[in-house]
C-alpha cells in the first residue's frame, strides 16, 4: 500500500539538540577538539589589532572556523560559505552558532583579511599551531623531508597578458590591491635592484607568473610550495611564489631555514625532483649537513655526433680536463654567470688533432664546470642506492598532497589576487590538510558507536 506523508501543519514547538544531530564520526566533530586547542590563544594574538572602545566586532574565532569549513569542503567563495553555514547544521555546530544565531556578512571576511588578519599574520600563526599539534601527537619524525611545488592558476585571463611597457599603471582601473602590492615590491628593493620585469605580465594580477608548466598550457599562475615530513606527510611549511622554477627552488631554502628556526627541526635528508638538483642547492644542503636524495640537473647532451661532455676526464689534482686524445683543457679561474668556470683547449692542439672533426667545429673545445661540481658529484654517487630509491618513493607523498588538494578540495584556481592573497589561500589549504591528517590519526570510534540522527 502506498504511503502518504501526512501533516500539513508544522509543529509549534520542537525539542531540538544541535549537539545530538552531528554524527560521532563526522569530519568536523573529529577536527573540532584540535581546532579548539589550536585557537586557544587567538584572541590574545589579535587583541592589539582591536580597539578598546566601540561596538563589539564579529568574533575572530568564528571567522577562522568558517574559513576552515570552507576549505574543508571546497567552498572558497565567502558569499556562498555564509549561505551554506546558514543552512547546514554541522557547519553551524562547528562554528558554535545556535539555530537562531546570525551568520556574519560575507564582507566581514574581506575587511578583516586586508586588515587585522594580514597585519597580525594570524593565518601563519594558526598554521604553526597546527604543526605543533602534529608534533605533540608524534606525527612528525623530523628525519626526512620532501619538497615540491605545484602551479595554481591565477585569477587572471591568459588571453590578456601584455608587455610591461604597454600597461599604464596610473590608470584608474589599475588602482587595485594586487597592483599596489606589485609596485610596492619594486619600491622596497630600491632603484639599484637587479630584478627584471617579465616579458609578459597580467594587468590585473602582475605578481603572478606567465607559465606553461601546468598541463602544458600557457597561463598566469602561482607556485604552491610544500615542505612535508615524509613520515605521515604532514606539511611542515608552505610558501607562495610566482610560478617560476627559480622562485620555487629559492623557496626551499626559505622553508628549511624557517622550519629550523620556528620548530627546531632540521632533516637528515631531503628528497625532491630534478628541478632542485642544481649545484647551488646541492652545495647549500650539504653545507647544512642534509643529505640530498635529488636527481642532478645535468647539462644537455650533444646530439650532433660530437664527443659528449662525459668523454672528457677531470683531473682534480691539476684542475684540468683531459680530452679523448690526451690534451688538457685549462681554466683562467673566472666565474661566469655566477656559477661556472670554462675550461678551454689550446687551438694549436686542436689543429693538429686527428679527432677534431668529432670534437668541435670551433678553433678550440670548451667545457663548462659548475663551481659546485663536487656537490653534484656527491649527489650523483647517491643515485641508485637503496636509500635513494626509498626517498624517491617518499617523494610521491608530497605529490599526493597536491592531487588531494586539487581533486578533493577543488583548489585549482586562485580566488584572491596578489602574492599576499596567494599566501592566505595556501596557508588555509595547508591548515585544513594537516587538520584532516591529525584528526584521522587521533580519532577513535567510541565503543558501540551508534550514529543517532533523532533528537
Language model segments and positions:
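Short arginine-rich
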Residues: 92-96
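Amphipathic alpha-helical interaction surfaces
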Residues: 69-72, 87, 91
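Short, flexible loop/hinge motifs at secondary-structure junctions
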Residues: 1-15, 166
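Anion-binding and metal-coordination hotspots
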Residues: 4-5, 74-87, 97-455
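Basic, short loop/linker segments at the boundary and entry of helix-turn-helix/winged-helix-like folds
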Residues: 24-68, 73
Amino acid at each position: 500500500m502506498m504511503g502518504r506523508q501526512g501533516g500539513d501543519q508544522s509543529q509549534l514547538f520542537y525539542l531540538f539538540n544541535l549537539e545530538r544531530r552531528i554524527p560521532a564520526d563526522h569530519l568536523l566533530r573529529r577536527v573540532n577538539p584540535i581546532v579548539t586547542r589550536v585557537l586557544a590563544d587567538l584572541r590574545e594574538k589579535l587583541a592589539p589589532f582591536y580597539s578598546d572602545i566601540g561596538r563589539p566586532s564579529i568574533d575572530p574565532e568564528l571567522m577562522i572556523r568558517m574559513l576552515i569549513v570552507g576549505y574543508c569542503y571546497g567552498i572558497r567563495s565567502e558569499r556562498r560559505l555564509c549561505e551554506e553555514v546558514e543552512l547546514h547544521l554541522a557547519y553551524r555546530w562547528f562554528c558554535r552558532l545556535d539555530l537562531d544565531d546570525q551568520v556574519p556578512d560575507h564582507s566581514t571576511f574581506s575587511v578583516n583579511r586586508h586588515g587585522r588578519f594580514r597585519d597580525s599574520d594570524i593565518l601563519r600563526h594558526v598554521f604553526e599551531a597546527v604543526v605543533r599539534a602534529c608534533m605533540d601527537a608524534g606525527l612528525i619524525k623530523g628525519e626526512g623531508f620532501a619538497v615540491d611545488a605545484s602551479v595554481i592558476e591565477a585569477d587572471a585571463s591568459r588571453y590578456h597578458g601584455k608587455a610591461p611597457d604597454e600597461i599604464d599603471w596610473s590608470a584608474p582601473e589599475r588602482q587595485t590591491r594586487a597592483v599596489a602590492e606589485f609596485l610596492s615590491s619594486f619600491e622596497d628593493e630600491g632603484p639599484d635592484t637587479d630584478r627584471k620585469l617579465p616579458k609578459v605580465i597580467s594587468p590585473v594580477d602582475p605578481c603572478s607568473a606567465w607559465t606553461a608548466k601546468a598541463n602544458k598550457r600557457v597561463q598566469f599562475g602561482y607556485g604552491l610550495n610544500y615542505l612535508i615530513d615524509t613520515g605521515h606527510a604532514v606539511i611542515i611549511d608552505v610558501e607562495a611564489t610566482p610560478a617560476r622554477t627559480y622562485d620555487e627552488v629559492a623557496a626551499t631554502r626559505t622553508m628549511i631555514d624557517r622550519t629550523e628556526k620556528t620548530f627546531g627541526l632540521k632533516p637528515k635528508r631531503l628528497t625532491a625532483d630534478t628541478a632542485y638538483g642544481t649545484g647551488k642547492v646541492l652545495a647549500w644542503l650539504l653545507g647544512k649537513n642534509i643529505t640530498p636524495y635529488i636527481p642532478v640537473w645535468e647539462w644537455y647532451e650533444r646530439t650532433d655526433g660530437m664527443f659528449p661532455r662525459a668523454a672528457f676526464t677531470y683531473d682534480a689534482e691539476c684542475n684540468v680536463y683531459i680530452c679523448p686524445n690526451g690534451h688538457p683543457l685549462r681554466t683562467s679561474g673566472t666565474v661566469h654567470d655566477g656559477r661556472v668556470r670554462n675550461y678551454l683547449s689550446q687551438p694549436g692542439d686542436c689543429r693538429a688533432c686527428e679527432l677534431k672533426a668529432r670534437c668541435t667545429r670551433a678553433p678550440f673545445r670548451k667545457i663548462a664546470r659548475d663551481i659546485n661540481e663536487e656537490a653534484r658529484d656527491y649527489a650523483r654517487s647517491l643515485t641508485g642506492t637503496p636509500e635513494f630509491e626509498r626517498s624517491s618513493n617518499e617523494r610521491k607523498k608530497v605529490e599526493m598532497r597536491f592531487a588531494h588538494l586539487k581533486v578533493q578540495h577543488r583548489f585549482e584556481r586562485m580566488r584572491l589576487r596578489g602574492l599576499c592573497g596567494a599566501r592566505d589561500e595556501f596557508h588555509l589549504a595547508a591548515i585544513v590538510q594537516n587538520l584532516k591528517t591529525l584528526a584521522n590519526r587521533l580519532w577513535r570510534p567510541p565503543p558501540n558507536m551508534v550514529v543517532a540522527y533523532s533528537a
